[in-house]
Amino acid sequence: MVPIRPALAPWPRHLLRCVLLLGGLRLGHPADSAAALLEPDVFLIFSQGMQGCLEAQGVQVRVTPVCNASLPAQRWKWVSRNRLFNLGATQCLGTGWPVTNTTVSLGMYECDREALSLRWQCRTLGDQLSLLLGARASNASKPGTLERGDQTRSGHWNIYGSEEDLCARPYYEVYTIQGNSHGKPCTIPFKYDNQWFHGCTSTGREDGHLWCATTQDYGKDERWGFCPIKSNDCETFWDKDQLTDSCYQFNFQSTLSWREAWASCEQQGADLLSITEIHEQTYINGLLTGYSSTLWIGLNDLDTSGGWQWSDNSPLKYLNWESDQPDNPGEENCGVIRTESSGGWQNHDCSIALPYVCKKKPNATVEPIQPDRWTNVKVECDPSWQPFQGHCYRLQAEKRSWQESKRACLRGGGDLLSIHSMAELEFITKQIKQEVEELWIGLNDLKLQMNFEWSDGSLVSFTHWHPFEPNNFRDSLEDCVTIWGPEGRWNDSPCNQSLPSICKKAGRLSQGAAEEDHGCRKGWTWHSPSCYWLGEDQVIYSDARRLCTDHGSQLVTITNRFEQAFVSSLIYNWEGEYFWTALQDLNSTGSFRWLSGDEVIYTHWNRDQPGYRRGGCVALATGSAMGLWEVKNCTSFRARYICRQSLGTPVTPELPGPDPTPSLTGSCPQGWVSDPKLRHCYKVFSSERLQEKKSWIQALGVCRELGAQLLSLASYEEEHFVAHMLNKIFGESEPESHEQHWFWIGLNRRDPREGHSWRWSDGLGFSYHNFARSRHDDDDIRGCAVLDLASLQWVPMQCQTQLDWICKIPRGVDVREPDIGRQGRLEWVRFQEAEYKFFEHHSSWAQAQRICTWFQADLTSVHSQAELDFLGQNLQKLSSDQEQHWWIGLHTLESDGRFRWTDGSIINFISWAPGKPRPIGKDKKCVYMTARQEDWGDQRCHTALPYICKRSNSSGETQPQDLPPSALGGCPSGWNQFLNKCFRIQGQDPQDRVKWSEAQFSCEQQEAQLVTIANPLEQAFITASLPNVTFDLWIGLHASQRDFQWIEQEPLLYTNWAPGEPSGPSPAPSGTKPTSCAVILHSPSAHFTGRWDDRSCTEETHGFICQKGTDPSLSPSPAATPPAPGAELSYLNHTFRLLQKPLRWKDALLLCESRNASLAHVPDPYTQAFLTQAARGLQTPLWIGLASEEGSRRYSWLSEEPLNYVSWQDEEPQHSGGCAYVDVDGTWRTTSCDTKLQGAVCGVSRGPPPRRINYRGSCPQGLADSSWIPFREHCYSFHMEVLLGHKEALQRCQKAGGTVLSILDEMENVFVWEHLQTAEAQSRGAWLGMNFNPKGGTLVWQDNTAVNYSNWGPPGLGPSMLSHNSCYWIQSSSGLWRPGACTNITMGVVCKLPRVEENSFLPSAALPESPVALVVVLTAVLLLLALMTAALILYRRRQSAERGSFEGARYSRSSHSGPAEATEKNILVSDMEMNEQQE
């Protein structure tokens, strides 16, 4: 139990709240305004144009000329879901729907009003404020074009008292710990005890721990968690190892991605777990004892230029990989520790959600990392040895094994090289190693496997592994380490390999030893090949340039990570200061250049830098952001500075620079394009097929396999060409048509050791930027960048999203052919309607499929014995080993375990080897075939095998079949009709369950046959008929010669196999009797219900489904066709209503709520099947009540039911912040919530549904004998049964205090149409409150506002209908508007009035006139007062009796979420309530 302050028992608590509200009081804890002033994320919004600050005044908003930072009504902060919260009003800024067609109301609204009108983009907020508050709007750029110059489109508005724009104080997700929300982020603000909290709070807790709710309203959902805090101790929530002084936090109950887990640890001043010693591994294993879990640790391979590393910068010297790990390092870049393998490590896909372990050292939460020592004390060395920092070094050019190299070093008085810092690595790389490709160093794990140590016995404090290394540490042949490549990266290698080596030994201290100055002036510090000096005066940028020039030098330039490390060491002791560099964007183009004009080849930006503004000069930060680069105002910001003076010829050779500059005259490969002014060629990889889209790391791999890189952009000119290329391919239509069409580019911040700094994957310096000025709550986990086709700007994105991408290759470079070997280059071999190519070179399954797609092919599918024999004959010719495995296209996904072919064709043929396939599990499976036996097996997809590609002119994908004809006729009693077929389920009595052939015979006796299922619609009908079936059912699908077919040889066009199926006994290659037959599963597992499985035809008995055609002599059943829109539909315990209108997701929700419903919840496969019939019958996708929060891929139901059953299409959900719909094939897909679909499904509530979109005021009850329906800001009364003339309609609505219907936008028209459509039989239409104004020559509504939206039906509105004698109406069947005469015709009536406060509906004479009634009222009042007094007395007594009797919160490491979740369910459980339960 998590204890808290006392809570009242339910009835006195609610009564007391009523009493206090009546008395003008409220329960709660007022915020501490003094503390709020210190909040760094709170700000005032200042208007440059109006010279004032934005202030909340009640429900209104105004600009006041007096800015007051202590006034809560002027204090704002960004909160969850891109909302703007006011501390004084404790509400969110929003817009209401227009009361007239010309005004939109800007005001303060309750933050739980789930509407897009509360969400703002910081980049456009200023423009919208100017527009809505009546000021002159900022000039906006033309849509679809690139912006140049200053990107600050909100320049009229900024944060008061600074030059910061409105994007400068963003909101970041805060991940909870413990509680009952599985680590889900806080929802800010949240409501607790009828009070809004805009941050974490200790309210309600006696122990003072900060907590937050993870849904909007704690009182309703009771979902919560503790907030992360940075502290210098390890008291609450941490386990401490007394031996090492390290602290550990095990978050077993959380489920986060690796990057989310890393962010959660960072928010506590910690990092993900690193394990650097055997003792530490043993200690962790002890804490894991008794638990069953897989947890994230800090091990990662996210640096595309480096190898495995710890996220906290610890050296990677101890390893505990499980056998065969790491595998697939190209795509699975994050490490886990597993209890099942006694603490063994595996690498996983970083995007999956898992528990995690944090680690920290006490008193080390904000200390900057100690820099390397760069001073060079003068020492004496023997001839041929070179000095550096007190040691001597020598290259041994003779190639020897590692052991022989070590002995040679020992003979010289030294040992093999040990490296302890970036400074030492730079010296070795630049001066000793030089042009030698690979050399031995002293690192090895010869003494103890997986534990690397230096041969000279020194401590391993620094590692610098090569990409994908260390990788073969398990193999005893790879126990020794080499240094190789221009950056000096390390690789583990066999110790018997013959290589040169480097020796190291201590130098002899010279007499009067002093630091070498290499000719630098006094006070200057040398670092090859320059002298450096710190200017201690704080000056603006131009003065810093002048002062360096006066000293015969320039402001410092930084060209590689070694120079960066050196400069950071110079400024280490200057806490809180900034130092100018030579980097600047003086022309405000968004492109940074060194003052020398040199290209920027290395960058080291701080978080959120270089920001959104154009222009500025770059300074180095200090403190916890030591050495990181930030953009500052060149003319107003004051900083210290660093001068650099070159000594001319470098004392030591320079490091190799970036790749040579490509030629302008080189040609581009076929299919690649360029511009005469650019040195690279470009290619867009885009596909409509979701399977061919890639994650960021997959897209990078594809580009690199071609010898190219993911797109990097160094200038506006280069990006302008890319934009032109995209417009040429996809068209220059309005941005809306390109919405959410994104392309991966090479920009990323995946590497945790770089903090949150953006880098190009090809090593190009990040010197040009074009980020869209948008913010997302989860920006911490958006580690990769995309180019947005709509805005042609960049947007951060989660790296695992599957998208298109763009590659870039230097001019004159040929696209690299895949290394496919000699036999792989054979011509394509034709068989029947397809061509096949056999590749003998070995690849993983995914890489093999990727190579096939380069030839417009897929890994082969197999659909007949003849095709299998053809493949087997060719494989026997190519395979020296007849048992060789070859990849084919059959595979499963991790999400559901169902087999599918890569080309989308159906599974109608199997050839499994005995014992295959293996039972389904969580891992993806891929299928191979053997050469001699021609049988299939499954194994891990990362295994490298040869493979077969197949291509054909006809697509293998089966298209959804058209609806069968709805033939006349019906079905006999006991049969269920659907379209033109009759179905009957048999086997309810166990004695009626028979073998397959007996089932077919039984059907034939009834003039029927076993069912054939031709499409998803028929499958949905059958699945929807299964809720009460408790046994499996034979269908007409069977296999006699390995290929499945229907009875009567009907073509097999559709299959619905269960996960891991078909896997039954493989039919014999020859024979006529069926040996494998299919059943429909009744399984209690939702993922198997209604799916197919293959069973032995002769050994098993089951129920069965018979099918026959309808009888023309019988009447059709009412349920014979798919559901139609409009009417209410009942299924099981649910009631639905189908909408068939063009709707956005929010519009659909509004429309459902106007029908006392909400968007539908799909709890099980039966309901899913029923809704599939609806979508298939309407031939249109339908919105459902499933959506994700802004910027998140976590999807949840509007009803807040758990997401236990899903029916996602492959690779879904795709969209962050998207909404879900049921497609015509029954699967769920996601898209932007602003997409217009042609329909939706409402789930009708038994009681009033919870309204997700709330508006001020309410509608009258029974006013003017009418029922009023709320919709947005208005109320509507529909009287289609009353047919009146236009004049009478006006009078009727005026009597009710409203007006005849006006329609101001498309959504309102859809709402009205939806309600008129159900009353089409009563009236053909309803009057519109519109007339012609001859003075202005325009149509106006009753309030004389112009008609700006219209929906005229053909042929439109002619001039003859624009007269005062014309009246206008809306047609019930179509929603179209029609003109007509005002007299002699009658229509239905729809009245409309604005919502008003509830007490506005009370009659003015509120007191009863009857004396008897008056006595009753007075008696009730006296009774209420007596109850109020009793409640107050009871409250005070219980409060004093229970105060102080609670235990403090405990840190719980539960191995099962169930008990802990029950314990942590409600933070408001008190001892009083427990005592009451015991009584």
Curated annotation (Swiss-Prot):
Glycans are attached at N101, N139, N363, N1028, N1348. Keywords: Calcium, Disulfide bond, Endocytosis, Glycoprotein, Isopeptide bond, Lectin, Membrane, Phosphoprotein, Receptor, Repeat, Signal, Transmembrane, Transmembrane helix, Ubl conjugation. GO terms for molecular function: carbohydrate binding; collagen binding. Residues 243-359, 388-504, 527-643, 677-808, 831-950, 978-1106, 1131-1242, 1271-1391 form the C-type lectin domain. It is found in: Membrane. There is a cross-link at K1141 (Glycyl lysine isopeptide (Lys-Gly) (interchain with G-Cter in SUMO1)). One of its GO terms (biological process) is endocytosis. Residues 1435-1479 are cytoplasmic. Residues 181-229 form the Fibronectin type-II domain. The chain crosses the membrane at residues 1414-1434. Interacts directly with PLAUR/UPAR and PLAU/pro-UPA to form a tri-molecular complex. Interacts with collagen V and with C-terminal region of type I collagen/COL1A1. PANTHER family: MANNOSE, PHOSPHOLIPASE, LECTIN RECEPTOR RELATED. C-type lectin domains 3 to 8 are not required for calcium-dependent binding of mannose, fucose and N-acetylglucosamine. C-type lectin domain 2 is responsible for sugar-binding in a calcium-dependent manner. Fibronectin type-II domain mediates collagen-binding. This is C-type mannose receptor 2. It comes from Mus musculus.
